[in-house]
């Protein structure tokens, strides 16, 4: 039993007396070379290699200098990239702006552009593409400027034909070559402001609508008919002749001025033509309320009672005088 277990252990785990055979046998020639050491032929070849190394260094330096000379000679034939931004197509005066926004970029052959080495063929292809794009951009801008000029017309351009004029806010709007203030909305066949969903402010400004606008037009027409410059001028001349143009701003004259205007003083001719009126006779006031005048103070009662007696005495005196003269 023990022998079988030992054999199983050797098979599974290996024997303790055996050594691992990891080394490989070297070739016979290599072993012989190690035993013999370096020969004379190897020494000579190594010496020749050492002599050739400085020559190779000199050749590499010569090649580097020749490459620099060639690059210097080829610098005259460097590729130039002309990148034109072109005029702005959104501007009206883009057609007159010269193509001055050009950026010239010189790229030498073998230069590192964008992390890649630029070769001669690649640079040539890139130049051709840029020139094609510039030509297309110039053509598009020219077409856009011509279209703008045709659309705007000569009225909205200045003398140079490049910039548009501003909007005249004082000019009255026209509709079919007629002023809008003379058009009655009822005459129009189409009334888009009556359509559902229409914005009335797109057709009437300042808060007007169809009815208030018609009322405004009728009122303006009435004012034009009533306005008569000649009549206003004649009224001003009349006021100037009467001296009323120098009145105060309030329009109210002082009391003496009003009296002088309403009651002018008569001249000499007026005095001759108009005689003074005779004075009214003094008739006694009739007695009221039992012989007493209303609201009469007591002191005034005695003279009124004496007035008939005085008249009687005067009449008697006159009669006596006449009798004496007759005698």
Curated annotation (Swiss-Prot):
One of its GO terms (cellular component) is mRNA cleavage and polyadenylation specificity factor complex. Residues 154-163, 245-271 have a biased composition (Polar residues). GO terms for biological process: mRNA processing. Residues 66-79 have a biased composition (Acidic residues). The keyword Amino-acid biosynthesis does not apply. Its main location: nucleus. PANTHER family: FIP1-LIKE 1 PROTEIN, PRE-MRNA 3'-END-PROCESSING FACTOR FIP1. This is Pre-mRNA polyadenylation factor FIP1. It comes from Candida glabrata (strain ATCC 2001 / BCRC 20586 / JCM 3761 / NBRC 0622 / NRRL Y-65 / CBS 138). The gene is FIP1.
């Amino acid at each position: 039993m023990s022998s079988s277990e030992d054999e199983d252990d050797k098979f599974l785990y290996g024997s303790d007396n055996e050594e691992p055979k990891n080394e490989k046998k070297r070739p016979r020639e290599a072993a012989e070379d190690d035993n013999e050491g370096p020969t004379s032929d190897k020494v000579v070849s190594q010496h020749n290699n050492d002599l050739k190394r400085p020559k190779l260094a000199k050749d590499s330096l010569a090649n580097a200098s020749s490459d620099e000379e060639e690059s210097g000679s080829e610098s005259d034939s460097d590729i130039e990239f002309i990148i034109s931004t072109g005029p702005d197509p959104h501007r009206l005066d883009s057609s007159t702006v010269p193509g001055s926004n050009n950026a010239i970029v010189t790229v030498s052959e073998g230069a590192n552009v964008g992390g890649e080495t630029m070769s001669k063929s690649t640079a040539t292809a890139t130049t051709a593409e840029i020139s094609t794009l510039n030509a297309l951009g110039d053509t598009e801008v020219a077409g856009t400027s011509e279209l703008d000029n045709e659309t705007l017309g000569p009225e909205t351009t200045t003398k140079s034909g490049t910039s548009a004029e501003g909007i005249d806010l004082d000019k009255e709007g026209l509709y079919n070559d007629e002023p809008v203030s003379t058009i009655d909305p009822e005459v129009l066949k189409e009334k888009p402001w009556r359509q559902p969903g229409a914005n009335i402010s797109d057709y009437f400004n300042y808060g007007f609508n169809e009815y208030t606008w018609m009322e405004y037009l009728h009122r303006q027409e009435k004012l034009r008919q009533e306005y008569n410059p000649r009549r206003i001028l004649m009224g001003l001349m009349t006021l100037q002749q009467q001296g009323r143009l120098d009145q105060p701003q309030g329009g109210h004259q002082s009391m003496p001025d009003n009296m002088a205007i309403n009651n002018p003083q008569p001249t000499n001719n007026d005095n001759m033509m108009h005689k003074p009126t005779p004075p009214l006779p003094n008739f006694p006031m009739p007695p009221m309320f039992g012989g007493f005048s209303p609201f009469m103070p007591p002191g005034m009662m005695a003279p009124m009672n004496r007035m008939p007696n005085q008249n009687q005495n005067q009449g008697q005196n006159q009669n006596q005088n006449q009798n004496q003269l007759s005698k």
